[in-house]
């Protein structure tokens, strides 16, 4: 039990985006970037020298840099090691005991590790909102848009998008900055978000929109 080995697959691009039901636009003063569970434990299942991990790392790094330039807060979620049976609860039935409390498992990968001032949430369930301060933080900052990237697309990323929607927060699900167990699961998450709870987009489209807003402001 645990995370299976994941075969390489092609990272979807703009040509693979499903049709969105909404046409929301990113506003720098409303948005927060969520970097979801980019811990070594979860990425060890991939071949780091092949897709989709190559693009995943590049695009999350790009999003983080561009958000930082514009004062958009960056929030990380990370699961703790050595979770007690009580804390882990039903997750154990599906995934086993989880990650050990060792840096080679719990640490966020170096390429996108948190900077001083970034928020790191201790995450206990699929959704980054469950048993964390994420909602309170968004509300305290007056922000109601969430840019979602990380792993895994059809599990925590998708459930976080659904939870955001149910809290009246607009989710922007970055198709080429999430990764999954397979191209089929990846596509399923994009189709669900676009038709039920948010906007699917790409890293380049997010950056383009941010630059456009910047140009208008200037």
Region annotations inferred by a language model:
Residues 47-48, 87-91, 164:
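Surface-exposed, active-site-proximal loop segments in enzymatic domains
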Residues 38, 79-81, 176:
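Active-site loop/turn elements of alpha/beta-hydrolase fold enzymes
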């Amino acid at each position: 039990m645990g995370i299976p080995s994941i075969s390489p697959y092609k990272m979807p691009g703009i040509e693979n985006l499903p049709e969105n039901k909404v046409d929301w636009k990113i506003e720098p003063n409303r948005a927060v970037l969520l970097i979801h569970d980019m811990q070594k434990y979860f990425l060890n299942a991939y071949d780091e020298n092949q897709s989709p991990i190559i693009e995943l790392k590049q695009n999350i790094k790009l999003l983080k840099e561009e958000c930082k330039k514009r004062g958009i807060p960056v929030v990380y979620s990370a699961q703790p090691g050595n979770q007690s049976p009580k804390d882990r609860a039903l997750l154990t039935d599906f995934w086993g005991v989880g990650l050990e409390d060792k840096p080679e498992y719990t640490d966020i990968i170096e390429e996108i590790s948190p900077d001083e001032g970034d928020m790191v949430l201790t995450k206990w369930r699929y959704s980054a909102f469950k048993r964390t301060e994420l909602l309170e933080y968004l509300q305290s900052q007056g922000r109601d848009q969430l840019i979602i990237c990380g792993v895994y697309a059809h599990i925590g990323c998708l459930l976080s998008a659904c939870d955001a929607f149910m809290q009246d927060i607009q989710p922007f699900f970055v198709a080429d900055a999430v990764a999954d167990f397979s191209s089929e699961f990846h596509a399923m998450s994009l189709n669900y978000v676009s038709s039920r709870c948010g906007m699917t987009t790409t890293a380049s489209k997010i950056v383009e929109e941010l630059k456009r807003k910047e140009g208008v402001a200037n």
